Amino acid sequence: MRTPIIAGNWKMHYTIDEAVKLVEELKPLVKDAKCEVVVCPTFVCLDAVKKAVEGTNIKVGAQNMHFEEKGAFTGEIAPRMLEAMNIDYVIIGHSERREYFNETDETCNKKVKAAFAHNLTPILCCGETLEQRENGTTNDVIKAQITADLEGLTKEQAEKVVIAYEPIWAIGTGKTATSDQANETIAAIRAMVAEMFGQEVADKVRIQYGGSVKPNTIAEQMAKSDIDGALVGGASLVAADFAQIVNY
């Protein structure tokens, strides 16, 4: 049985004080959640948020990291730095990183491997553009991403990866894939994982939906057989909204 996982990606929002205020509001609202709850603040807020959620059921993730151990990479954060802070998760290959920062599948693959080397669980993002959806190449596009991003992992590692299916056309646009569309694509992703690592691994991998997830859409999505959670953007910035999603 897969434990559902709902993660809030705060993107480039909130100072340290604002971030701590948000988790303090969130804590009592999600304490009885039946799913795993993760918040992903900016790098500067990670330490304060990690301390604020100590002893609760809320886990903490980073939004990105470099794949190298250390070195002359101005502005970057190494996996071992996140490990030293006891961070639980790291988002890898978000469409905004791929689009604005030229992140490639090769880079994502290195980051996924680096995450495992440092006791971090990757939340690996994949998804198609509106043009790709309309011309019927969704599965081809995602298969190319998944195959490249997970290449070289052991079965033990592969089953721990959290995959977030985020149709790029539904991020921050207010457009949402229908729950049937999302479930269909997520089932296809599970089949891709099975092809690479076997059905047993595929049955353990948790696959989230991410793309304008809202309190009023989550229940229908979570009722689908292959959807194991959500990667939430805007709605995770308000404690009451995120709690409503978590307590679907």
Curated annotation (Swiss-Prot):
Its EC number is 5.3.1.1. Disulfide bonds: none annotated. It holds the Pfam family TIM. CDD domains: TIM. InterPro entries: Aldolase_TIM, TIM_sf, TrioseP_Isoase_bac/euk, Triosephosphate_isomerase, Triosephosphate_isomerase_AS. GO terms for cellular component: cytosol. Keywords: Cytoplasm, Gluconeogenesis, Glycolysis, Isomerase. Pathway: Carbohydrate biosynthesis; gluconeogenesis; Carbohydrate degradation; glycolysis; D-glyceraldehyde 3-phosphate from glycerone phosphate: step 1/1. It comes from the Bacteria. One of its GO terms (biological process) is glycolytic process. Homodimer. Belongs to the triosephosphate isomerase family. This is Triosephosphate isomerase. It comes from Clostridium perfringens (strain 13 / Type A). The lineage of its organism: Bacteria, Bacillati, Bacillota, Clostridia, Eubacteriales.
